[in-house]
Amino acid sequence: SEMCIRDSNLRGRKMNSLRKRGIIIFSILSLVIVACGGAAEEEVVEETVEEAVVESLDSPAVTTATAVKTGTGVTAEPCPAEIGGVPTGADQNKGCIYLGLLNDYTGPYAPAGPGLELAQRAFWLWANGAGGIGEYSVAIREGFDTGYNPQKHLEGYTAIKDEVAALAMSLGTPQTLFILDEMDKDNMVGVPMSWWSGWSYKENDKGLIVEFGSQYCADGMNAVDWSLENLGDIKTVGIMGFAGDYGSDWAAGVAKAAEANGLTVAWTYTPPSTEFDVAQAVGLMVTQPVDAYFPAISAGLMAQVAGGAAQQGLTPFAILAGPSFNDAFVQEGFPLKGLFESGAIYAMGLGVAPYEADTPGHAVMRATMSQIVESANAFLVAGWSSQYHLKGVLEAAYKGGDISRAGIRRAAANVTVSSDGMMEPRELGQDRADTAAYIGIPDGSIGSGQRVLAFN
């Protein structure tokens, strides 16, 4: 991806060892093995208490307005007490800001969808209890099943857009890109559940996408650099992935770092996800052996590729993109548990500190989630952390006196957001990608299935 490659800050930062720290990494797909791989017219209500001067959100300083402009998806009536089987924690004396949810319940990422959604709803349960957004609580409406299909994604967007002020989640990069023009017409800001490097640049996302975590391309670069520093003599590598935002973005980062380090790329296999052939992937490893390979595929296919290569007597180092790993790989009874714990396989995180990390944000997440579900899986971390930056955007919009969709969009274009330590603070709208990365080794003795080795 050109977006990733052109950023000179994406590589060359040495990853710090975590061998002496008891921190556990998470990988984004870790519940079960999955084979995945015209403008809307807003009705604006204004309550004018007194004439007030409100500074633009383009200014570093924003005064708190005495009158707040509202619009589509914002009501004076309180949020429901429960949506989607999860309490909203809404203050019944406050109004409600509604968010939309474009999820996958029946497609390749169906195993991920419920966990992501549960954590997002739990986040706002906590946030509402902590005061909400000024005189408003926040609630996520019932999710729409897109099946990870762009056309269904558009259908879902069309169905919910007149009822929400922003999107709590739009799962999938191609799917989100497919609706981006409509989002632009509607001033609809949204959180992606993907880590495409292009989300960091306004020329791609029109200033509408509230990204979080590191990007696939940066992770690919960091994976190569770390492997060369820690895994011995690596001279020949292979690159494997799905064509598109995920695999191609990762492949671009791996290729760039390989070139910079003088490595030979023996082969690159990046077909569309629907055309990925395990036999062909294993065949490349057999006919053109490599010292290490870097896959960005689904967890289900990853197990087949690693297992197929091992059956042929091949166990080169493998440094996986986060979605290629699954904690089921190291659970008791899984046939390839020994292979994944052999020291030949490693996996990147996705730029969010792991579940057991010692930050205020993680502590709040664990305390809240433990009241709802007994689990430490990665979907919860990804879902919860995805909402922090949106919360910051809504807070900025409210402070600026405009929580209409136009006001929310303006806030998203220029605001510094934080996450109680879960991620580094980020200034949105700056055409700059995050580079924080985690890398871990599969370990079945740990709840999340991986032990962190390094971060940067």
Each PLM stretch: what is its role?
Residues E82-G85, V164-Y269, F317-S342:
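Extracytoplasmic ligand/sensor domains, especially the bilobed periplasmic-binding protein
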Residues H389-N456:
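Extracellular/periplasmic bilobal clamshell ligand-binding domains
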Residues G84-P87, P111-L118, A130-E203, F212, ...:
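Beta-alpha junction/loop-to-helix N-cap segments that form part of ligand/metal-binding clefts
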Residues S1-I5:
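Short, small-residue-biased leader/transition segments that mark boundaries at the very start
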Residues A252-A255, A299, Q304, P354-A411:
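Extracellular/periplasmic ligand-binding modules, especially the Venus flytrap/periplasmic-binding
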Residues V74, C79-N93, G100-R121, G143-P150, ...:
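Extracytoplasmic "Venus flytrap"
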Residues A309-W384, P442, Q450-A454:
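Extracellular/periplasmic periplasmic-binding protein-like sensory domains
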Residues G37-V45:
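Bacterial lipoprotein signal-peptidase II cleavage site
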